[in-house]
């Protein structure tokens, strides 16, 4: 932890500004034009990164929360300066080329956080976000900049299904709490409630305490913290996309997290919360029991309890104050005891086999029992468009494994979600009759017999590139296997004759992204 806090009580300018600007008078003269007072000269400057815009419905209330954050900062002796950041809405990209841009924007957001913080010498940061890519994006930036920081998630929308379930947005807000970078109960409090506004106010006050004590993200985002977050993720059955986002945040924090870590921790972490889309329960119901702190209290025997959090206390100290309201459970599967879980292992499963030598992911907590083992002929599509066209016309058969390739992080490029294909199968009543497999990914709002993130992807020469319609694919979720029933020699023969397809995009951001991005199960980030 840093010893030179730069707070007003030190009687000197904030440390970042003083170290970077011998001519601080010039800098402060510009801040005076922003409306600061002369008495603010010795106060820490806190950057308030707000991903508000009029496009993303989950971000509409962030302006109000930012005002609460700045009020908290000011009441604790600091100055909060708000700035904007790009933030996409995944829904606008569904089943069209716009989805190629959604995941890459996560890294653009992380870069924006870094660029603004370093260019303007903030003493600390509060980062407000609500949605799928902006949440991990600002967390990546927070980890990279490594100044006293707090993440404020937007919370859940009352009676709004996309918000009350463990889609990617809410999964990442829950995992921010599990990592220790968000105040307890922020994720599961209703977005526009007085309680959520109060949590935003507290975040503004607490970031000043972090500045005073010199507590930075690297004190919090340790390997032990990431292992805690993975266990919470398995216990709640979070989004597929957490396999991409947690390793990316870890990379920016200087910690290596792999798909094998998810696999190892899933084996010893029970699935405790049957929350949508996997099950009938909702996040607001989990909040009645105690939210993510209650989940972590149940998991306490499996967690690293001495990790630091943004409360300024360890996880152990935080959990000592948590009471689980078991009698308030509206449904027994909202949260189950450790010795009586929904299932004995985690709600996400890493599959491997000759079809996915480096791995693939299924949300096992949302798979029907009769689909845990499945074998059928492949029906191969070389793009999402081809698959969507066929599925919309019901041009497939029960018992098939529908396989979509060339939609990976390089091939897409940008790894667009294949969610509309999955949702169409669900509406057609086929979730107990077919499997969908892809080197692309899915929305966190998806569940069922959907396998994604097949790695290596097709355009990088993974075996998925040479599967032919009619080849038999065997899936065994219990044994964590996915295989095409072909001799190794035949797979190698096909691969030796295979040539990668021409890039779909040759200029602009996506072209640069495809050339530089690391594989999805390593985090899909720009190094």
PLM feature spans:
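Short, well-structured alpha-helical segments in soluble
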Residues: 108-120
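Catalytic or ion-coupling anion/metal-binding cores of large enzyme and transporter domains
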Residues: 2-58, 65-86, 91, 97-102, ...
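A short, small-residue-rich loop immediately preceding and capping a beta-strand
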Residues: 117-138, 150-154
């Amino acid at each position: 932890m840093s010893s030179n806090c730069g707070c007003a009580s030190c009687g000197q300018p904030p440390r970042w500004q003083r170290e970077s600007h011998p001519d601080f008078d010039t800098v402060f003269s510009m801040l005076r034009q922003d409306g600061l007072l002369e008495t603010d000269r010795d106060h820490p400057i806190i950057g308030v990164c707000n991903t508000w815009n009029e496009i993303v419905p989950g971000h509409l209330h962030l302006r109000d929360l930012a005002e609460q954050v700045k009020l908290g900062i000011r009441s604790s002796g600091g100055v909060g300066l708000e700035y904007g950041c790009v933030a996409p809405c995944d829904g606008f990209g569904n089943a069209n080329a716009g989805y190629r841009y959604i995941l890459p924007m996560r890294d653009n957001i992380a870069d924006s956080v870094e660029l603004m913080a370093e260019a303007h010498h903030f003493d600390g940061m509060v980062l407000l976000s609500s949605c799928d890519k902006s949440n991990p994006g600002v967390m990546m930036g927070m980890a990279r900049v490594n100044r006293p920081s707090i993440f404020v998630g937007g919370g859940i929308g009352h009676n709004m299904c996309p918000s009350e379930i463990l889609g990617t947005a809410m999964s990442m807000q829950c995992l921010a709490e599990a990592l220790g970078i968000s105040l307890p109960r922020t994720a599961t409090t209703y977005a526009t409630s007085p309680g959520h506004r109060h949590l935003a106010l507290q975040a503004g006050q607490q970031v000043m305490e972090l500045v005073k004590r010199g507590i930075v993200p690297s004190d919090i985002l340790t390997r032990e913290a990431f292992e805690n977050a993975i266990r919470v993720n398995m216990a709640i059955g979070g989004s597929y996309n957490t396999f991409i986002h947690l390793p990316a945040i870890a990379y920016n924090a200087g910690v290596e997290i792999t798909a094998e870590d998810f696999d190892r921790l899933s084996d010893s972490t029970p699935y405790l919360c049957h929350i949508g889309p996997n099950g009938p329960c909702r996040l607001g119901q989990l909040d009645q029991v105690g939210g993510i702190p209650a989940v972590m209290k149940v998991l306490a025997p499996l967690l690293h309890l001495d990790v630091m959090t943004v409360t300024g206390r360890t996880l152990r100290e935080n959990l000592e104050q948590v009471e689980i309201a078991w009698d308030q459970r509206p449904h027994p599967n909202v949260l189950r005891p450790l010795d009586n879980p929904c299932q004995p292992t985690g709600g996400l499963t890493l599959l491997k086999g000759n079809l996915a030598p480096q791995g693939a992911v299924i949300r096992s907590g949302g798979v029907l029992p009769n689909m845990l083992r499945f074998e059928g002929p492949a029906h191969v599509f070389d793009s999402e468009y081809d698959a969507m066209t066929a599925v919309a016309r019901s041009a497939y058969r029960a018992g098939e494994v529908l396989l979509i390739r060339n939609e990976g992080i390089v091939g897409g490029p940008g790894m667009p979600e294949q969610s509309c294909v999955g949702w169409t199968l669900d509406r057609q009543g086929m979730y107990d009759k077919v499997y969908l497999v892809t080197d692309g990914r899915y929305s966190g709002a998806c569940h069922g017999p959907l396998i994604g993130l097949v790695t290596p992807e097709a355009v990088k020469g993974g075996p998925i590139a040479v599967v032919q319609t009619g080849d038999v694919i065997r899936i065994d979720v219990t044994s964590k296997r996915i295989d095409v029933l072909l001799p190794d020699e035949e797979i190698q023969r096909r691969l030796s004759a295979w040539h990668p397809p021409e890039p779909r995009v040759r200029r602009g951001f996506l072209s640069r992204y495809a050339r530089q991005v690391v594989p999805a199960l390593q985090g899909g980030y720009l190094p």
